[in-house]
Amino acid sequence: MNNVTEFILLGLTHNPELQKFLFVMFLITYLITLAGNLLISVIIFISPALGSPMYLFLSYLSIIDIFYSSSIAPKMIFDLISENNTISFNGCMTQLFTEHFFAAAETILLSVMAYDCYVAICKPLHYATIMTQSMCGFLMVVAGILGFVHGGIQTLFIAQLPFCGPNVIDHFMCDLVPLLELACTDTHTLGPLIAANSGSLCFLIFSILDASYVIILCSLRSHSSEGHLKALSSCASHIFTVILFFVPCSYLYLRPLTSFPTDKAVTVFCTLFTPMLNPLIYTVKNKAVKNVIKKLWKQIMTTDDK
């Protein structure tokens, strides 16, 4: 039986001055996230020079980051200046689904990108025959489907729990642990199963990524010094992105089902700052992307002068 039609979100802080500061900072960060990831996606789609699988996956990652951040950030930002910090039951379930859908899709996509890096370094002569356009499309579809399944399982598990009274969530969003704490039933058995769906996915993919890079680093011994540095440079951005994504993910889901004061800060970092940093990580040392951006900028300036 479910008597709860809406949840009250306590948010990040009750300090009015801090709320105003966070509102401005988070709004700017979110707009940079949208602009940066959209720019990367558009540049890759319109530039023939960035037609390799690596850039195709990067554009897909940017699109996922836009939706992932947008599933949480707008509501969180608006609530900082709103006096009515509530969310309907259906809205809560929708937020839970979209968050886990896009997070899982990104998790799987990062493993696909690691596989692409492995093939490029360890099997360079067979790269063109393995990483075909159809294979890349297939891998991206698989990431989307598995993300959808993961998000659906999490949402169905939570939605069927009875919520009969308490409806105050000590968070700025709907997530597994806060909702399990409000359920009017014993969740000692079901709770770990729900958490394991996220925790096991996080642990499995992170283990696959670790194994991939161990193999890559071992294979680099047979490369020349120049080839060694070039290969490391091509993978460094991906490794940094993996660390930014999986360290917070592991903290949130590879642990007992208990809320901690730091959960809110870690979630903000995951959903707002990591998606903002990803475009910067992949462009700072990427000459191909920077050259395309410079070329497009020159074309725009030339057009304006005319």
Swiss-Prot record:
GO CC, alphabetical: plasma membrane
Residue ranges, Cytoplasmic side: 47, 122-137, 221-233, 285-306
GO molecular-function terms, A-Z: G protein-coupled receptor activity; olfactory receptor activity
Record topology, Extracellular segments: 1-25, 69-100, 159-199, 255-263
Matching InterPro entries: GPCR_Rhodpsn (IPR000276), GPCR_Rhodpsn_7TM (IPR017452), Olfact_rcpt (IPR000725), Olfactory_Receptors (IPR050427)
Chief site of localization: membrane
Transmembrane feature ranges: 26-46, 48-68, 101-121, 138-158, 200-220, 234-254, 264-284
UniProt keyword Transferase present: no
SUPFAM superfamilies attached to this UniProt entry: Family A G protein-coupled receptor-like (SSF81321)
Membrane-protein topology: Multi-pass membrane protein
Cross-referenced Pfam families: 7tm_4 (PF13853)
Gene3D superfamilies, per the entry: Rhodopsin 7-helix transmembrane proteins
Disulfide bonds: 92-174
Localization in the cell: Cell membrane
Annotated glycan sites: 3, 84
Sorted UniProt keywords: Cell membrane, Disulfide bond, G-protein coupled receptor, Glycoprotein, Membrane, Olfaction, Receptor, Sensory transduction, Transducer, Transmembrane, Transmembrane helix
Functional summary from the UniProt entry: Odorant receptor.
Family: Belongs to the G-protein coupled receptor 1 family.
Name used for this protein in its record: Olfactory receptor 4C45
Provenance organism: Homo sapiens
Lineage: Eukaryota, Metazoa, Chordata, Craniata, Vertebrata
Gene this chain is encoded by: OR4C45
